[in-house]
Amino acid sequence: MALGGTVNAQTASPQANDPHVISDQDMELLRKDIRSQKKQLMAANLKLTDAEATKFWPVYDRYTADLIKINDKKYGLIQEYADHWGTMTDEQASSFLRQWLDVDIAIAQLRQKYAPEVAQVLNGRKTATFFQLDRRISMMIDLQWASKLPIVQAQE
């Protein structure tokens, strides 16, 4: 998975004309590619039997569909943050923080919702492995985004 990179808390403003800024269409293609790679990574690490796979992948697909909805909000927040960076008021910063925390809570609640369902189709170790991989992949993606976005305080 091409998710590696260095971590820098950037302080420069995101540039709208920067050739490295990704378009909405390119973002959607990137997200689809990540989802495909994630599924391949899950398959390689879970080593499911045919019987497990038959039961697990439909649950995984429902989980992923629900996660996409939450991630749509997350990527909308990232875009909004980039659009307002440098002009963000205290009120906007507080609103951004509340919305970001709501996204984090929604992801945790989604995992809690699906944990018993996954546990019905996989044993305990494979269930734990699935959620561990899911969380690690999400953290790697979040770290990639965090390293590219300037911090709020830097706009002063």
What name fits each language-model region?
Residues 9, 36-38, 141:
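Hydrophobic transmembrane signal anchors and adjacent membrane-proximal interface regions, especially
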Residues 13-19, 26-29, 33, 108-156:
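Amphipathic, charged alpha-helical segments and their helix-to-coil junctions
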Residues 3-9:
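Sec/Tat signal peptide C-region and signal peptidase I cleavage site
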